């Protein structure tokens, strides 16, 4: 059973009533599935809705490499200066205006049993109440613990740049296991789109690469050992486990947090003399050059989450709304990029800014590989007669990876 319309808004926060009054979820057609539509005029720059995820989890390699984040909400735990020191590889790196760092270490708390860290007592209690009682391994760091074996197996088959985590699936199961009203949570998770068997296989192949059938069988065995739940018995069959992978692979919204970026934004808001502004901007530019030289592109604490209302937003290469995480945790904001009229569909982009500037052929390649659909937004329709050309680098990637086999492609996005 799909989630009710009431359930769709149940994780909205802050302006939840505003969201109910300004948007609605409609069934579009058999290709697009659901979509989110404005019911009143939404002005450019307005926050359309703010939403918490059903579940979220930090990527496992990201956590292993000491990107320290709250185990529940993914808020960055390092002070901005500590963050800069680690990313530049310079223990003596000093930041000006340290008072602009928003990290409150005095509020941090850890689980008294397994010692995972939280940004606050509220997050520690929220995790314990929702899923952590099931997932807490206790004081033992025994690599033979079922959850430790599961995480190690995942890291061995899914390398950076990461796009999903087996622990997001684990938290889904643990949430249902701990819940008094199990049907409520199953209904919420069933809200996310379903795929055909061939589409699911293509998504699993994308996530696991290589001998994905053997890897999927290994992960399923460890998943059963660690988390089996009778109420979710279908998820523990080969077909159900593959469906769970496809759900997470196509519906997981990436989350990124950084105490350093928060500090930079605070610096941008300072009222300074032109000379001081130039000096500070030069310092920050050099800092990011040093970070790029030492660390490359991996700057943030990274993870993913499942958002019910946001998942109703379909894709467009010319979106009229965007997602962001301005609170430096897993709370998602959807903001209008232009005026949106009543009855108009609210679309976000699943591509980043650079990807959206690529050719139609390149955009479709990315969307097919990651979401199994061909876009028919106004930009793609306008470029339909353009030649199918792409860069030499992408052609080399095509030769190395190949296109997903047996994937059934939709003409448009389906509820991701």
From Swiss-Prot:
A zinc finger (MYND-type) spans 98-136. One of its GO terms (biological process) is regulation of stem cell division. Its main location: cytoplasm. It holds the Pfam family SET. Residues 383-416 are annotated as: Disordered. One of its GO terms (cellular component) is cytoplasm. Residues 21-351 form the SET domain. CDD domains: SET_SMYD5 (cd10521). S-adenosyl-L-methionine binds at residue 350. Disruption phenotype: Mice develop normally and are fertile. Conditional deletion in the stomach inhibits malignant progression in a mouse model of gastric cancer. It is found in: Cytoplasm. Keywords: Cytoplasm, Metal-binding, Methyltransferase, S-adenosyl-L-methionine, Transferase, Ubl conjugation, Zinc, Zinc-finger. GO terms for molecular function: histone H3K36 trimethyltransferase activity; histone H4K20 methyltransferase activity; histone H4K20 trimethyltransferase activity; protein-lysine N-methyltransferase activity; zinc ion binding. Protein-lysine N-trimethyltransferase that specifically catalyzes trimethylation of 'Lys-22' of the RPL40/eL40 subunit of the 60S ribosome, thereby promoting translation elongation and protein synthesis. May also act as a histone methyltransferase in the context of histone octamers, but not on nucleosome substrates: trimethylates 'Lys-36' of histone H3 and 'Lys-20' of histone H4 to form H3K36me3 and H4K20me3, respectively. The histone methyltransferase activity, which is independent of its SET domain, is however unsure in vivo. Interacts with the N-CoR complex. Interacts with EHMT2 and CBX5. This is Protein-lysine N-trimethyltransferase SMYD5. It comes from Mus musculus.
């Amino acid at each position: 059973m799909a989630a009710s319309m009431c359930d769709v808004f149940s994780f909205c926060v802050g302006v939840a009533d505003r969201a109910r009054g300004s948007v609605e979820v409609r069934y579009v057609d058999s290709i697009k599935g659901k979509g989110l539509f404005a019911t009143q005029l939404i002005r450019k720059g307005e926050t359309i809705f703010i939403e918490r995820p059903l579940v979220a989890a930090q990527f496992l390699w990201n956590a292993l490499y000491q990107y320290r984040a709250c185990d529940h909400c993914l808020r960055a735990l390092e002070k901005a200066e500590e963050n800069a020191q680690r990313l530049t590889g310079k223990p003596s790196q000093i930041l000006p205006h340290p008072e602009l760092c928003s990290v409150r270490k005095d509020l941090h708390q850890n689980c008294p049993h397994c010692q995972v860290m939280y940004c606050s007592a509220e997050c520690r209690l929220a995790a314990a109440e929702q899923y952590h009682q099931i997932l807490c391994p206790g004081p033992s760091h025994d690599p033979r613990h079922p959850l430790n074996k599961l995480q190690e197996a995942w890291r061995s088959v899914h390398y950076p740049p990461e796009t999903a985590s087996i622990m997001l699936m684990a938290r889904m199961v643990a949430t249902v296991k701990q819940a008094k009203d199990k049907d409520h949570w199953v209904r919420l998770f069933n809200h996310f789109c379903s795929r055909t068997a061939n589409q699911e296989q293509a998504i699993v192949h994308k996530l696991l690469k290589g001998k994905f059938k053997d890897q999927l069988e290994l992960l399923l065995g460890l998943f059963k050992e660690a988390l089996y739940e009778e109420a979710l018995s279908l998820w523990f069959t080969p077909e159900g486990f593959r469906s769970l992978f496809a759900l997470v692979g196509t519906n997981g919204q990436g989350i990124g947090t950084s105490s350093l970026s928060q500090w930079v934004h605070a610096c941008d808001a300072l009222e300074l003399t032109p000379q001081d502004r130039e000096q500070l901007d030069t310092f920050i530019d050099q800092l990011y050059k040093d970070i790029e030289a030492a660390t490359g592109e991996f700057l943030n604490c990274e993870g993913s989450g499942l958002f019910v209302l946001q998942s109703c937003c379909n894709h467009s290469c010319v979106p009229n709304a965007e997602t962001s995480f301005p609170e430096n945790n897993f709370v998602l904001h959807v903001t209008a990029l232009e005026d949106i009229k009543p009855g108009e569909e609210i679309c976000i982009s699943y591509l980043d800014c650079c990807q959206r500037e690529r050719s139609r052929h390149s955009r479709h390649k990315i969307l097919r590989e990651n979401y199994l659909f061909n876009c028919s937004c106004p930009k793609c329709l306008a470029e339909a007669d353009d030649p199918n050309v792409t860069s030499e680098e992408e052609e080399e990637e095509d030769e190395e990876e190949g296109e997903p086999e047996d994937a059934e492609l939709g003409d448009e996005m389906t509820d991701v």
